[in-house]
Amino acid sequence: MEIYTMKTNFLVLALSLCILLSSFHEVSCQDDGSGLSNLDLIERDYQDSVNALQGKDDEDQSAKIQSENQNNTTVTDKNTISLSLSDESEVGSVSDESVGRSSLLDQIKLEFEAHHNSINQAGSDGVKAESKDDDEELSAHRQKMLEEIEHEFEAASDSLKQLKTDDVNEGNDEEHSAKRQSLLEEIEREFEAATKELEQLKVNDFTGDKDDEEHSAKRKSMLEAIEREFEAAMEGIEALKVSDSTGSGDDEEQSAKRLSMLEEIEREFEAASKGLEQLRASDSTADNNEEEHAAKGQSLLEEIEREFEAATESLKQLQVDDSTEDKEHFTAAKRQSLLEEIEREFEAATKDLKQLNDFTEGSADDEQSAKRNKMLEDIEREFEAATIGLEQLKANDFSEGNNNEEQSAKRKSMLEEIEREFEAAIGGLKQIKVDDSRNLEEESAKRKIILEEMEREFEEAHSGINAKADKEESAKKQSGSAIPEVLGLGQSGGCSCSKQDEDSSIVIPTKYSIEDILSEESAVQGTETSSLTASLTQLVENHRKEKESLLGHRVLTSPSIASSTSESSATSETVETLRAKLNELRGLTARELVTRKDFGQILITAASFEELSSAPISYISRLAKYRNVIKEGLEASERVHIAQVRAKMLKEVATEKQTAVDTHFATAKKLAQEGDALFVKIFAIKKLLAKLEAEKESVDGKFKETVKELSHLLADASEAYEEYHGAVRKAKDEQAAEEFAKEATQSAEIIWVKFLSSL
């Protein structure tokens, strides 16, 4: 290494002497003033050469320390490249001094050209080394890297030329200074990248990059990662550019308010989805107690309704906020209409949920319950999809400024998709409503058929009602029995209707006795209505006495007298009073009317009205027949319901017990199988253990013999490797000396040519 340092110093001194001789020759050909300036320039160059020599000595010392941990080939090649670079830089400086430096930019350009020449020289050396190794693939890869570095240096040279041209043509204003600064920074980055690639190429050339494929894959992956990062950065820049160009129409407060409202709507939707899921679970696992199950379903539906109403209010608020934004009128109107349509869909969904609440109060069979559960699951999925759409819409609202055409179209498509999801959900609710109404219609039809059968039985039991009609009409003229005959209360216990056609007559079997009905009514309501007939008779007598006191005389049995006094004011007032009382009961159904405690008083009032108004058909007599029938029907319905609930409970108990039996049986069977398998494994392991012990003894004997042979082979191999390493070191030393001699010869030839050219 010391010999190499001495040779390097000698070459540098020789080069300096050549420069001095050429400079003196030029001084002799010039005048005195120019000669002094050239001498000063030569002196400065000589001082620079000495400083460079000292720097080279320091680098050689550091390289010497580093070479103790590296092979000789790497150190030799590194010094060779350093020497060639220094020589080329010296040659460049000599030629530049002969022409004269115009500016600092020309000097930088010359340094880059010197680096370019060194790159070409390194490329030729790399090609020679690779031709020796016959590795075409590695040579192509190295050549490609050299070409890339060359392109980068050419780009740097072009940038310097452009910078020099701009410096000549333009002034030193601030804009030009900034441009020049950016170009210089770009050149510096390219130079650093090229330097790093040269170092990597140098290491690969001198150490032999055998893992070329692995290195190439690693390089490719790094480039792809960088490319992805750049693409992400470009997208971010484009997004930032769009945001800067369009501007933000909403201030921070408005954006925060919209975001909070959208989050609130999202929470409402999630709560509604959870409620629907809970409702589905409740419907699939119907509670044993039907009343408790109905109450639970009612509470869930009411909770869903509240959630939807809250979401509707949030949408209204969002609608108001969005209407105040400074946007285009067309886009604002379109958005307003979409939000209003979503609001209407919410309200329709709320109404449908109320209707569903009414329909789900009754009990349904297993098939109907399964169908409803399936439809509720579909509705839940639709609402979840709508929730996802709202989340996406929230993100877009938070990041967007004024709506341009692309954002408006995207927003419109998302709102339309949410609308379709809600329409599908509402369609599912409507389908549930239709199915439940169909079931109610079927039940109503069944009840109607039962009532028609009862009516036919009444007609068959009293087929001779027409024959009795004349008797009832004649008996009606008698004052003592007027009201009972109007009600159709006969002495035989049967009931009929007076002044009716054959098709409209309704009768009941004789098994429903009027006396029994009256006794039952007196037991329920006390002594005031102990006898319906007596009460009605007393009412008629009181009415007769009142009329006789007012008019003097009145004969109710005479049709002519009744017709002459029917327009009296007292009778009209009484009729109007009774009509007003009866009109108050107009909203009640027949079942509700019969089950009232004052049903007897209502019958008396209705009979009085029909008597005083001379009604052609007595409807109140029909109503009196159905009281016990309706009560028995209600009691039968309660008994049926109790029986169904009891059967359902017993079925569930039996199912649970059978499930427990099946579970214990499966557990016992599984344990038996595991016990048998473990027994087989234990037996096999014992047998295998015996075989393994015998095999281990055999392997131990072979191992001892192999160890003895291995000790002899290790000694022979160590001696062979020592001889091999000695031969390799000797060959590398000889190769380093040969390459150094070649490099020195080439450098001397170049210096000699330059010297001759300067004469």
Swiss-Prot record:
Gene Ontology molecular-function annotations: calcium ion binding
Start and end residues of each stretch annotated as Disordered: 55-74, 154-184, 200-219, 271-332, 393-414
Per-repeat ranges for EFE repeat: 91-138, 139-176, 177-215, 216-254, 255-293, 294-329, 330-368, 369-407, 408-443, 444-473
Any coiled-coil regions, as ranges: 142-461, 685-734
Superkingdom in the source lineage: Eukaryota
Signal peptide annotation: 1-29
UniProt GO BP: defense response to fungus; photomorphogenesis
UniProt entry tagged with the keyword NAD: no
Subcellular location, record wording: Endoplasmic reticulum lumen; Nucleus envelope; Cytoplasm
Induction: Up-regulated by wounding and jasmonic acid treatment.
Segments of skewed composition (Polar residues): 63-74
Keywords: Coiled coil, Cytoplasm, Endoplasmic reticulum, Nucleus, Repeat, Signal
Post-translational modification comment from the UniProt entry: Binds calcium through the EFE repeats.
Free-text comment about domains: Contains a N-terminal NAI2 domain (474-759).
Record's function text: Involved in seedling development in the dark. May be involved, when interacting with TSK, in the organization of spindle microtubules and may participate, when interacting with GIP1, in structural links between the nuclear envelope and the cytoskeleton.
Subunit description: Homomultimer. Interacts (via C-terminal domain) with GIP1, CSN1 (via N-terminal domain) and TSK (via TPR repeats).
Protein name (Swiss-Prot/TrEMBL): TSK-associating protein 1
